[in-house]
Amino acid sequence: MRKWILTWILPTLLYRSCFHIICLVGTISLACNDMTPEQMATNVNCSSPERHTRSYDYMEGGDIRVRRLFCRTQWYLRIDKRGKVKGTQEMKNSYNIMEIRTVAVGIVAIKGVESEYYLAMNKEGKLYAKKECNEDCNFKELILENHYNTYASAKWTHSGGEMFVALNQKGVPVRGKKTKKEQKTAHFLPMAIT
């Protein structure tokens, strides 16, 4: 009689343990699939906070993207025919179409397609435009967790901190010395041209 009970209990225990293992594995895979890349990077034990931001292949050299840079302050970055850098709220303005060219890994040069001027920043953090591309025209492009991009001068810093391309609430460029990565004035969406 005991053998008969064991043969019925043993398969039940096996089925239950298999069921629990399947549920456990399913829960883990569902939890991993629901994670953002930043959360998964945290679980992999990345120590640097810079590693938690996304990176794309186009940042590795030679790529050219044509985009409108839309600031979180509701202005498009614009370089006009005289080389003046400012914001515009006109989406269809031809001077707000930018060519974002990868110079090195994570480093880009931004050029107005219509004006043919490059965006540049001097050591005081003032944004201006140049016909010829040089080190002042190189910016570190960083994609933030909120899906916005920041552009910090690759050459210049202020008191050890980065200086960012930024447009204030009136569309006027903010000096790099007064900017921080967290400020919405420095957050841009590279919008595809439609």
UniProtKB/Swiss-Prot annotation:
Position of the signal peptide: 1-31
Disulfide links within the chain: none
SMART domains in the record: FGF
Subcellular localization, as worded in the UniProt entry: Secreted
Protein keywords: Glycoprotein, Growth factor, Heparin-binding, Mitogen, Secreted, Signal
Record-linked PROSITE patterns: HBGF_FGF
GO biological process: positive regulation of cell division
Chief place where the protein resides: secreted
GO molecular function, one term: heparin binding
Pfam family, one: FGF
Glycan-linked positions: 45
GO cellular component labels: extracellular region
Domain of life: Eukaryota
Family per record: Belongs to the heparin-binding growth factors family.
Function of the molecule: Plays an important role in the regulation of embryonic development, cell proliferation and cell differentiation. Required for normal branching morphogenesis. Growth factor active on keratinocytes. Possible major paracrine effector of normal epithelial cell proliferation.
Subunit structure: Interacts with FGFBP1. Interacts with FGFR2. Affinity between fibroblast growth factors (FGFs) and their receptors is increased by heparan sulfate glycosaminoglycans that function as coreceptors.
UniProt name for this protein: Fibroblast growth factor 7
Natural source organism: Canis lupus familiaris (Dog)
Gene name, Swiss-Prot/TrEMBL: FGF7
